């Protein structure tokens, strides 16, 4: 990729007198501190930009955007666009020629007497950088002969200038930015752009003896024309522009941070989170006992006839079925390796995680430019479980595990000593940079964290967006998202995948056919074409028998307790899930006050990682035990119980819960469903899946759960969602993509696409206690708090 950077001195000769940053002892005077020139900072940013583009193969994405967005633009027009794009980096800090910035921030009076902005702008520089960018490129755009190309390139010039203006803050609304250039009489939005424009006019007249050739301000009719061009009527095109702007903003912020840290702290970034060589990882993976068994089966047995598999005993056939699905998925992937969206739908307990791990490695091995893997899970417990599994798979080999990082709110930032052997300030600065920009080849994280990267408008949300380029994304349990967002999610995922060259594997035991919600006719690939034959195999369909007898009576905790006491006599492992934490705690207290001949345990979302691990260890050792839990038990908790009780909610949740029962297929499992708490009161996000007609309160839903025919269930759900999105209200999907996504209303998109509606006011309360981790290791809360205070 040939990057042509503009010489800043040809744009503004005064840059040679300007500084960008200062460092040194804060006790020294401004004049005594070492300073980095504006040209030095700009060149360092350009160098980091070239490195990231090269290492992350970003040119592939840039070329794809040009193909998708400028389908009919001439080579001359494309070249001009590329110059505008790359020189966003060059221009981002040129506004530091502001004399007030130089004097206040740098102690530099070389520009004294030069045109100064008024107090509204003061010592700010980003907005001045944006108007200087516009002044430079609007003049040159006007020389483009083709009218349509001229208009399109002018639109992009404004968009690029907006990214420059916002590179020290959040991505706000593009419309508000344009309105800010209006005259002081315009009451719409702020007028910072107008003040910057007045400074530019004065600067050019007084310092350069020139006039501003092209006015920055666009009148309303011109703005409307621009928004019609950039948004159009195609949702895919709207996503392409939205994704491109986030990518360029992410790159701009990244190179600015890297260059600044390089100068201020001496931290030179050499790796940018890509998998340079996966052969050692695949080699270690294929040497595991499970993989060797699969490969031997592939040579000698695969594929087996379905009739033969049905006749085998349950305990004997389950591994054969898992292997068949593993190889089906692998072969289908190879046949459709050039596609972008893949669905992996397997029964609960079929080994989806291992299948997805193999698929991600196969993609890296076979697809040029793919160089990163994300594993995204709905809960932190699943993240914990899978990083533990990866440690077992790779035998905790340091060279492999160093490439894998957990990114969530619970796990500390990954520390990897390289050139910074001692834990100095430099060491921690690099740790922070790696975390902020996800500079890890393999990342395990949660839906919430990933969605912030995809859609969040705060600067910190967009930091790592460029890391999505040329990556494999494994999405676990997508049905756990709010169903009101499914249409928007699949539209975004398809657009992002095509633009950013992502391979997205969506996996679940209960997977909605999201293709029905999008107008994009490029179908996703079902990795297991004959999935029904697996779902209906007795080993999965009959592993756990659902019992609905308790639904026939008005349930109380006393009635439930009496029923559970009878099951205790069978000396089995019993799991009881409530959808209300209050009910779970009350029932646990009731059981502990009752004389029963087994130990009773409790787990909720408040249980720490350590507490959960201790509970899981106990469950594996005890033959007779009761575990009372909340929904936290549905996923990410590796347990195998004999008998289950569950308060009914979503059908997806019922299936997930049943996956905790009789996982080994060594006996017969049973789950008793009861109706105690209102699911509608628990799920307050309007999810129609908790409507009575879609729960096991209805016999047709009971039949679906028994036969695992979830396609019928989701067919009804999706039909309702499709009709809702066509309604003339705030849920209208066409309006959302055209008016908000297509017109770059970042805060509105962020608000709509967040996963959790948090309505509580939270306050952290730290309680001191002593944890006994082992016979030789204890953690004292008081000591931890004192260490924290000393930081």
Where do the language-model regions lie?
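N-terminal accessory nucleic-acid engagement/regulatory domains that precede
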Residues: 1-16, 146-309
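Walker A/P-loop
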Residues: 337-360
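Inter-Walker segment of RecA-like/P-loop motor cores
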Residues: 397-455
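Conserved Walker A/P-loop ATP-binding site and its immediately adjacent core
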Residues: 371-394, 408-411
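C-terminal helicase lobe and adjacent C-terminal extensions/tails of nucleic-acid helicase motors
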Residues: 497, 562-571, 577, 582-595, ...
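Conserved helicase ATPase motor motifs in RecA-like P-loop NTPase domains
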Residues: 344-350, 477-517
